[in-house]
Amino acid sequence: MMKDFIKLKDKNNIVTIEKGELISFKVDGSEYIHQKGSKGWRKSDDEMFPIIGPVSKNNFRVHTKKGDAIQDQHGLLREMDYVLISSDEKTAKFSKKYVKNTKLINSKYPEKSTEEKLFWPFDFTFEKHFYLENNTLKINFIITAEAGMPFMLGYHPAFLLSSSGTDTLVANGKKITLKEIYEVGHNAFPVLNTDKIILENSDRNHLEISTTNFNNFMLWTEVDNMLCIEPISQYTSYTDEKFSEENMRISSGKEEFSITIKVL
């Protein structure tokens, strides 16, 4: 049976993982991850797969060459539990394995959705690997599936802010304020065609968040103590595009993505 909590340690850095969810990243005693139970969001990280965004505008249907799949906001991966593959002092590896057309209970039903069960017409294995070293946490995502499977991928970590409302971000050479992010609301603020964002904390060291293969971010918050900085393979909120494989990435069989969170 998997331990609920795993701690990774390196010098003055401690990462805490709960059943595959990143719930703490402390460097020299300072916390950088939003704490569950605080105002804002009930989680501290999540993965969006194989869909990003609200599928309700598409009647919860995603068109694929194997027929229409039923998905809810941000996909069905979040309805599955991680299994621990291995861990040691500085690394931990988790996976989720899905068998095509398996119906999963939708936790959004009935309060926020009309769909009681979700399914996807492709097999896949989704791995999440954590590596801690020198003030830096790297997380790799490895998706193994049949070649030709359409997908989107997003990672949804929540970072702790100062509660002052004065924390800022820098991306593509431009400064972004929390006020700008609030104004976009639930659609999330797009930061496209970049693989790096700096979070300028007003009360702690800054964070550099860099990625591979995502090439986009979206930013979301409704509170001043937390900010979701989400690497995404594509941004779906402002389009009227149908959720269809024509508008998604297509798997080569094995796809790898990563995020690196570095304390500056």
Predicted regions and their residues:
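Surface-exposed acidic/polar loop and edge beta-strand patches at domain peripheries
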Residues: 1-136, 149, 160-264
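Short, hydrophobic/aromatic alpha-helical segments in well-folded domains
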Residues: 125-126, 140, 154
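Asparagine-centered strand-capping/turn motif at beta-strand->loop junctions
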Residues: 141-147
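Surface-exposed beta-strand/loop patches in extracellular or lumenal glycoproteins
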Residues: 153-159
